[in-house]
């Protein structure tokens, strides 16, 4: 016989406390309860279980005697157990889980499930759907119920009830569909009690849309209509009666034996139509998610060549030709110099595009898409302004020192962003820095390690590529397997600073390209710092010298460079604009009475 699950029918009042019992609860929790004469284990643990969202119907209690667990009935008197230890475990049939809280902003109308007040910023359990304010978190039970798992348990429970072998008394006015859906006001509905845990109702909505955030795509659970607590208690009781009773080995009551399962439940082939429909819909939803999830993300960024119109050739660089084009507006299309790309090159190029498509910064040219047919091409925003090289060395634009320092700051800011994204430019120079709409710096032609590497078949060759004047010594020597680093970009930035602070290119007195490569690679040649403008601040001169160091370990990184320039900008003297005041356009004499003026003239 199974021990009774309810409280003992005793009218005796509990007497004084006689001791304590230590109780180990689920989820690695523990408590100490007071032992009183005339009280049972059921009564003593009632409060400790309810504050944790549990009840006696879904748990089993053991006595811990010499390290071994012995099942104990709930109606056992607590007084003889003074000084002992009890263990409470959740029945295996009851699918209780831990909460999965996420911070959420509720843009639709929502209310806290505890204080019932309006909720905008709060938390939500992805498993059971409970939502609450931060200051209401102490009222949330430590365990929750996955309602999708409960629905399957409900189906099996009702199927067993309809089999006749272990029938329970089901309320006659409730059908199967009514049992599985939230009920409105009825004789069985109880009002929410703040001390009792009320599970949210399963709404079973269709699969939510694929969101662009990293939040898991889970079924949203509505909590507007709380589930009838009497139904939950009834179902939990049906779970507990699924067991055939504990044997002599002290097995818990809630653990059904294989014999009891096979004798009480029907064949697995005879399933309810509702359960079959649910499993079919879940399978269809999984297929939809799989089809959407495994699509290559580059699919949405590759532009068909038929949609792009090339208008005018702008110029040719080291790695490609730039055209002005039309694709939903003016764009810049750079057709890269890659003849007959191999499969390895194509895959490496697409991998780089997945990195570049995530770049968004005010000082970086906006990446808009790419093309792989008939050749590699990159589509970026169109910049109306000219390059920094054109301003300094062709148009001979005159900038004051404050403007030059601001251009240097914006360039360092854009490079700092690229390095934070682990993108090495590899070809930073004044030709790839554009002044857009005034003095807004836009850095282009960044990344593209696939295109900027010499290939021999499927293997990259270790040869220097790029513009000689902006190459660091280690890039020219090519002694390392991969000489390109953050510090090599810093050296190129130092040459750009040299152009800004002198208005000329380095090594202009040497006409041989091979001689420049040899002498810079050996460390015999460096930019002439005597040409720097006389009004250049000393801090900028020191920064330029540090960026052009021969040893790359001695060069600063862009976070330090940016901080130095920003500090320099704040220290520069500025002409503060005076506050505007009205001008009366009259002299002080106009305000004096005429009699006073005549009297003043008579005074000797």
From Swiss-Prot:
Zn(2+) 2 binds at residues 112, 115, 133, 136. It comes from the Eukaryota. One of its GO terms (cellular component) is cytoplasm. Its EC number is 2.7.11.1. Zn(2+) 1 binds at residues 99, 125, 128, 144. Dephosphorylation by the SHOC2-MRAS-PP1c (SMP) complex consisting of SHOC2, GTP-bound M-Ras/MRAS and the catalytic subunit of protein phosphatase 1 (PPP1CA, PPP1CB or PPP1CC); this relieves inactivation and stimulates kinase activity. Residues 178-222, 241-287 are annotated as: Disordered. ATP binds at residues 314-322, 334. Residues 210-222 have a biased composition (Polar residues). It catalyses: L-seryl-[protein] + ATP = O-phospho-L-seryl-[protein] + ADP + H(+); L-threonyl-[protein] + ATP = O-phospho-L-threonyl-[protein] + ADP + H(+). SUPFAM superfamilies: Cysteine-rich domain, Protein kinase-like (PK-like), Ubiquitin-like. Residues 252-265 have a biased composition (Low complexity). The keyword Kinase applies. Keywords: ATP-binding, Kinase, Metal-binding, Nucleotide-binding, Phosphoprotein, Proto-oncogene, Serine/threonine-protein kinase, Transferase, Zinc, Zinc-finger. The modification Phosphoserine is found at residues 157, 162, 186, 255, 267. One of its GO terms (biological process) is regulation of TOR signaling. Belongs to the protein kinase superfamily. TKL Ser/Thr protein kinase family. RAF subfamily. Involved in the transduction of mitogenic signals from the cell membrane to the nucleus. May also regulate the TOR signaling cascade. Phosphorylates PFKFB2. This is Serine/threonine-protein kinase A-Raf. It comes from Rattus norvegicus. The lineage of its organism: Eukaryota, Metazoa, Chordata, Craniata, Vertebrata.
